[in-house]
């Protein structure tokens, strides 16, 4: 078992950057060239998982090793919710982070992975503060919004990040005598609720994911308080992946500078084809 503070420290190093989904070594090299702080190795981006249907599982270890061999930046990989054996395999490969991801088909509808039993740090998604604190209680070192991956639609990520921020502000301003009741209502560990009350933030970095397709989307999430951004289908489902990837990296760096945002948003070609969120929602997987 690894010290959670070491894991959180590794996650802190990704702040202010972009983590990009890649499905092969060539895309991984493009992501690194564009300035990504990490890549997420997977066989299909979320848009294709939605399109193809079926059961989405951990990627082939051969693919993950190929991607790890061509980049020097951290490599993440996804395991199904509750599938601790997939996580054991990924840890044995030497990935830098494991994402216990709702994008893949859940393996356990009741239990998430005991992340404290692993040396590798875990990323987990949330839709609200209670969900975030439950994952942190299990050992997650990094939290992200779930959004709605594969849609190119930012609305759910915005809703979720605003909800987390609203919940944090409520707890920060609550009377200490109310914290146990709040913990009960959130179904969250009491010690983590008291941490939020004292510090006004999560005890781990808080990133955004799910639906980021443009530089403006990325800057929006940063202005709303995200500390970094995951981009899945939005880059390599667009007309010019390298140019769009560089633009999104710049947007995360200069998220408060509208002039730079306007410049990097010019002439990017067609973005990914977006879809509405009126269908099965990946964000409802897990609890």
Curated annotation (Swiss-Prot):
Active site per UniProt: 78 (schiff-base intermediate with d-ribose 5-phosphate)
Pathway(s): Cofactor biosynthesis; pyridoxal 5'-phosphate biosynthesis
Reaction(s) this enzyme catalyzes, per UniProt: aldehydo-D-ribose 5-phosphate + D-glyceraldehyde 3-phosphate + L-glutamine = pyridoxal 5'-phosphate + L-glutamate + phosphate + 3 H2O + H(+)
Keywords: Lyase, Pyridoxal phosphate, Schiff base
Residues annotated as binding D-glyceraldehyde 3-phosphate: 162
Pfam families: SOR_SNZ
EC number annotated for this UniProt entry: 4.3.3.6
Domain of life the protein comes from: Bacteria
Signal peptide per UniProt: none
An annotated GO BP: amino acid metabolic process
A single GO molecular function term of this UniProt record: pyridoxal 5'-phosphate synthase (glutamine hydrolysing) activity
Disulfide bonds: none
Keyword Lyase found: yes
Annotated positions binding D-ribose 5-phosphate: 21, 150, 211, 232-233
Function: Catalyzes the formation of pyridoxal 5'-phosphate from ribose 5-phosphate (RBP), glyceraldehyde 3-phosphate (G3P) and ammonia. The ammonia is provided by the PdxT subunit. Can also use ribulose 5-phosphate and dihydroxyacetone phosphate as substrates, resulting from enzyme-catalyzed isomerization of RBP and G3P, respectively.
Subunit annotation: In the presence of PdxT, forms a dodecamer of heterodimers.
PANTHER family found in the cross-reference section: PYRIDOXAL 5'-PHOSPHATE SYNTHASE SUBUNIT SNZ1-RELATED
Similarity remark: Belongs to the PdxS/SNZ family.
Protein name from the UniProt record: Pyridoxal 5'-phosphate synthase subunit PdxS
Organism of derivation: Francisella tularensis subsp. holarctica (strain LVS)
Lineage: Bacteria, Pseudomonadati, Pseudomonadota, Gammaproteobacteria, Thiotrichales
Gene: pdxS
């Amino acid at each position: 078992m690894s010290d959670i503070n070491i894991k959180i420290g590794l996650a802190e190093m990704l702040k202010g950057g972009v983590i990009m989904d890649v499905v092969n070594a060539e895309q991984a090299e493009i992501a690194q060239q564009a300035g990504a702080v990490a890549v997420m190795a997977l066989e299909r981006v979320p848009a294709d998982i939605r399109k193809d249907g079926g059961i989405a599982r951990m990627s082939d270890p051969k693919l993950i090793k190929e991607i790890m061999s061509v980049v020097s930046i951290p490599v993440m990989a996804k395991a199904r919710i509750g599938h601790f054996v997939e996580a054991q395999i990924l840890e044995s490969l030497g990935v830098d982070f494991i994402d216990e991801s709702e994008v893949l088909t859940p393996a356990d509808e009741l239990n998430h992975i005991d992340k404290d039993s692993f040396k590798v740090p875990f990323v987990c998604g949330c839709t609200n503060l209670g969900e975030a604190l439950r994952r942190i209680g299990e050992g997650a070192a990094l939290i992200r919004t779930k959004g709605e991956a594969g849609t190119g639609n930012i609305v759910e990520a915005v809703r979720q990040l605003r909800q987390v921020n609203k919940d944090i502000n409520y707890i920060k301003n609550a009377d200490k005598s109310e914290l146990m009741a709040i913990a009960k209502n959130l179904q969250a560990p009491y010690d983590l609720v008291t941490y939020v009350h004292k510090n006004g933030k999560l005890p781990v970095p808080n990133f955004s994911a799910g639906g980021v397709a443009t530089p403006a989307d990325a800057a929006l999430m940063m202005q709303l308080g995200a500390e970094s951004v995951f981009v899945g289908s939005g880059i390599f489902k667009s007309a010019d992946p390298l140019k769009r990837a560089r633009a999104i990296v710049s947007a995360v760096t200069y998220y408060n500078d509208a002039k730079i945002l306007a410049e990097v948003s010019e002439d990017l070609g067609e973005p990914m084809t977006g879809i509405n969120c009126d269908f099965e929602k990946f964000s409802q997987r897990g609890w």
